[in-house]
Amino acid sequence: MDAIKKKMQMLKLDKENAIDRAEQAEADKKQAEDRCKQLEEEQQALQKKLKGTEDEVEKYSESVKDAQEKLEQAEKKATDAEADVASLNRRIQLVEEELDRAQERLATALQKLEEAEKAADESERGMKVIENRAMKDEEKMELQEMQLKEAKHIAEDSDRKYEEVARKLVILEGELERSEERAEVAESKCGDLEEELKIVTNNLKSLEAQADKYSTKEDKYEEEIKLLEEKLKEAETRAEFAERSVAKLEKTIDDLEDEVYAQKMKYKAISEELDNALNDITSL
């Protein structure tokens, strides 16, 4: 009987232990189910987060791709700009060389102009001398004309006296001879005056020819000076255009450099964000 009681107690104890174990198992089951549900929720959240991260990574990848394309375009623009700058530098060098040559030609032209002005001054002084000589020759010619007129008057008087002597040949033979001598002297002097008049006329023609020659030279010098001034003005215009082109290209280069720097900073920021996102994914 005692054995049965002990066995009943043992069975009762085993039953209580079994009930406790069952309750514990039920609690463990519920805890496991709760944990499993929590894990499933965490898994779903992780899947959503992973999907969002993948979308974000894809978005960042597209942004990086766009940034790389923009960077390549900016680098290409920078390369083209450097080529343009090199070409512009060559053009500037050519313009400077052409400007130096123009300045040399201008200096030569100014020297020639100075020489021409000196020659013109000398020519002007020569013209004044020639004019003074011409005035003196005119005065001399007027004097010779007066002398010629006087000689003609003397000749006329001689003719009249000759006629008078002819009428009074017998009485005035001696006076007739003197009148004939005076007439011969007058005729000789008249011939000399005619020769001097021819010489004066030739001198005047020579002076007129020289004056025309100097006038032609002066017109030629004026044309050369005008041509040189036009060439100088053209060279100055090309130099101003080259300076404006240089300033414009320098501004373009500065803008491109700013754009390249901005693209690099943007690419750096995107790379940092992408690295952080990848680190977050790796840590998960």
UniProtKB/Swiss-Prot annotation:
Keywords: Acetylation, Actin-binding, Coiled coil, Cytoplasm, Cytoskeleton, Muscle protein, Phosphoprotein
Modification Phosphoserine, positions: 61, 87, 158, 206, 215, 271, 283
Gene3D superfamilies documented for this protein: 1.20.5.170, 1.20.5.340
Sites bearing Phosphothreonine, chain numbering: 53, 79, 108, 252, 282
GO biological process, one term: muscle contraction
Coiled coil, from the record: 1-284
Compartments reported by the entry: Cytoplasm, Cytoskeleton
One MF term in the entry's GO annotations: actin filament binding
GO cellular component, one term: actin cytoskeleton
Annotated InterPro entries: Tropomyosin
Pfam family, one: Tropomyosin
Region (Disordered): 1-78, 117-136
Amino acid composition bias (Basic and acidic residues), ranges on this chain: 12-40, 51-78
Post-translational modification Phosphotyrosine, affected residues: 261
N-acetylmethionine modification, residue list: 1
PTM remark: Phosphorylated on Ser-61 by PIK3CG. Phosphorylation on Ser-61 is required for ADRB2 internalization.
Domain remarks in the Swiss-Prot or TrEMBL record: The molecule is in a coiled coil structure that is formed by 2 polypeptide chains. The sequence exhibits a prominent seven-residues periodicity.
Protein purpose: Binds to actin filaments in muscle and non-muscle cells. Plays a central role, in association with the troponin complex, in the calcium dependent regulation of vertebrate striated muscle contraction. Smooth muscle contraction is regulated by interaction with caldesmon. In non-muscle cells is implicated in stabilizing cytoskeleton actin filaments. The non-muscle isoform may have a role in agonist-mediated receptor internalization.
Family statement: Belongs to the tropomyosin family.
Record's subunit section: Homodimer. Heterodimer of an alpha (TPM1, TPM3 or TPM4) and a beta (TPM2) chain.
Protein name as annotated: Tropomyosin beta chain
Species classification: Eukaryota, Metazoa, Chordata, Craniata, Vertebrata
Designated gene of the protein: Tpm2
